[in-house]
């Protein structure tokens, strides 16, 4: 586990949602774990991780939370803020992990979409697999960056300032993510329509 708070410069560099993210070869993950008790929730832990040699950050988090003694009678919500969306293999591992913990829900807010093999189209399929497993996936917006800045960054009481293009890139990436997940949304919409009609 890294130190509790990230350095400002490191956060801004690693999480910046630029179109061409050259030199950003690691994934950083900020997380919040909450236990849900009726309509209220109780924070259990928060922090951040990054890739270690030979192990992606998503798998590091799964190892970390696997050591917890999660009460099967309680509901838990995990929220990730990631610099890159998960690769296909990590998405598969996360979906499989969640299958074993039906009382744990996951939300992922990502700065950028990761695609390492454009010919294979594996990463988009990994995102669809996560969505089918019940994971809420979204692109980080100003509100998410602001939250991360105030929760995970050693900000010395400086206010978060958006960089040029933050909003436009969030919109562009959100549209791209929507196109990736669109077939699943259409199936969900059809399912809801049939349910409404009683079919």
Swiss-Prot record:
Positions of region (Important for interaction with CTNNBL1): 39-42
Chain positions of motif Bipartite nuclear localization signal: 1-30
Tissue: Expressed in lymph nodes, spleen and thymus.
Cofactor dependency: Zn(2+)
GO cellular component, one term: P-body
GO molecular function list: cytidine deaminase activity; RNA binding; zinc ion binding
Modified residues (Phosphoserine): 38
Location in or out of the cell: Nucleus; Cytoplasm
Enzyme class: hydrolase
Nuclear export signal, short sequence motif: residues: 184-199
GO biological process terms held by the UniProt record: cytidine deamination; cytidine to uridine editing; defense response to virus; DNA cytosine deamination; mRNA processing; negative regulation of single stranded viral RNA replication via double stranded DNA intermediate; positive regulation of gene expression via chromosomal CpG island demethylation; somatic hypermutation of immunoglobulin genes
UniProt region (Required for interaction with RNF126), positions on chain: 88-116
Disulfide-linked positions: none
Assembly and binders: Interacts with CTNNBL1; the interaction is important for the immunoglobulin switch activity of AICDA. Interacts (via its NLS) with KPNA1. Interacts with PKA/PRKACA and PRKAR1A/PKR1. Interacts with SUPT6H, TRIM28 and NCL. Directly interacts with MCM3AP; this interaction may favor AICDA recruitment to immunoglobulin variable region genes, hence promoting somatic hypermutations.
Name of the protein in question: Single-stranded DNA cytosine deaminase
Organism of derivation: Bos taurus
């Amino acid at each position: 586990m890294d130190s509790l708070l990230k350095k400002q410069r490191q956060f801004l560099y690693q999480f910046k949602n630029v179109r061409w993210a050259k030199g950003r070869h690691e994934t950083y993950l900020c997380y919040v774990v909450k236990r849900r008790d009726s309509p209220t929730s109780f924070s259990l832990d928060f922090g951040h991780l990054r890739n270690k040699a030979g192990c992606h950050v998503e798998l590091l988090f799964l190892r970390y939370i696997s050591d917890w003694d999660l009460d099967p009678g309680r509901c838990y919500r995990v929220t990730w803020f990631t610099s890159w969306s998960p690769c296909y293999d990590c998405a598969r591992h996360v979906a499989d992990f969640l299958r074993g913990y039906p009382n744990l829900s996951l939300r992922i807010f990502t700065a950028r979409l990761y695609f390492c093999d454009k010919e294979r189209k594996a990463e988009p399929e990994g995102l669809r697999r996560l969505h089918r497993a019940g994971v809420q996936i979204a692109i980080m917006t100003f509100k998410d960056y602001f939250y991360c800045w105030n929760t995970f960054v050693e900000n010395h009481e400086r206010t978060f300032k958006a960089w040029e293009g933050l909003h436009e890139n969030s919109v562009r990436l959100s549209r791209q993510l929507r196109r990736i997940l669109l077939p699943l949304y259409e199936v969900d919409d059809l399912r809801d329509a049939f349910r409404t009609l009683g079919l």
